[in-house]
Amino acid sequence: MIKLDFEKMGGLIPAVIQDHESGEVLMVAFMDEKTLNLTLETGKTWFFSRTRNKYWMKGEESGNTQEVKEVLTDCDADTVVIKVKQNGPAACHTGNRSCFYVKWENGEWVEHSNPLFDPNEVYKK
Amino acid sequence: MIKLDFEKMGGLIPAVIQDHESGEVLMVAFMDEKTLNLTLETGKTWFFSRTRNKYWMKGEESGNTQEVKEVLTDCDADTVVIKVKQNGPAACHTGNRSCFYVKWENGEWVEHSNPLFDPNEVYKK
């Protein structure tokens, strides 16, 4: 029976969140065993924030939740790819559709930011 | 100027390798600053193996190298997505096209292995 390996990263695994239709990688965050189980049980994506040291559900503040369509793990069971339907206009807290809007071009990182919502409106301080 | 944050994971960042045409996530591995620079300079994917504690180029043994087409980082610059042309039949050392051939189905992980080469042939002991 396959069991996920959380040990390699001290209890966490990377979770690659992919748009189930376009294949675009929307974000990469981290899960522990509890948040992976919450994701599998609720059908919404839950993560462990390394910086805020807390559990969080994607969209708990913004409403931009993610509906789980498919969950895959890899050959050494230490990473997951989760295909989701992204609710709302964007996945990234900056308002960008995907968090991966910075591209390596001619020897430097170039931002291609195109926010689809105003973070100041969505994330009230 | 954007600089990648290797500190969060003690010198490493996750690298999500995606087929540049199909969008399929082929594998997730880890890079340090040196292997990211090698990847950007050589146009082939280089990683740091946490288990073997060494640098490796994808395909150095199998010949299944990966040609870098596009490199993206995210809003907090601590992860990269690299779109590649996969040379040879498969990315995974098991012979599967993608390492993500295990799917969560009805409460358990189910293997959907379909090797496109024989690892015993390709990886001589």
Curated annotation (Swiss-Prot), chains A, B:
EC number, as in UniProt: 3.5.4.19
Cofactors demanded by this protein: Mg(2+); Zn(2+)
One GO cellular component term noted in the UniProt record for this chain: cytoplasm
Principal EC category: hydrolase
Keyword Zinc: yes
Residues the entry annotates as binding Zn(2+): C75, C92, C99
Pathway: Amino-acid biosynthesis; L-histidine biosynthesis; L-histidine from 5-phospho-alpha-D-ribose 1-diphosphate: step 3/9
Role of this protein: Catalyzes the hydrolysis of the adenine ring of phosphoribosyl-AMP.
Chief localisation class: cytoplasm
Annotated HAMAP family: HisI (MF_01021)
The organism's place on the tree of life at top rank: Bacteria
Family: Belongs to the PRA-CH family.
Quaternary structure annotation from Swiss-Prot or TrEMBL: Homodimer.
Keywords: Amino-acid biosynthesis, Cytoplasm, Histidine biosynthesis, Hydrolase, Magnesium, Metal-binding, Zinc
This protein's record includes keyword Zinc: yes
Protein name: Phosphoribosyl-AMP cyclohydrolase
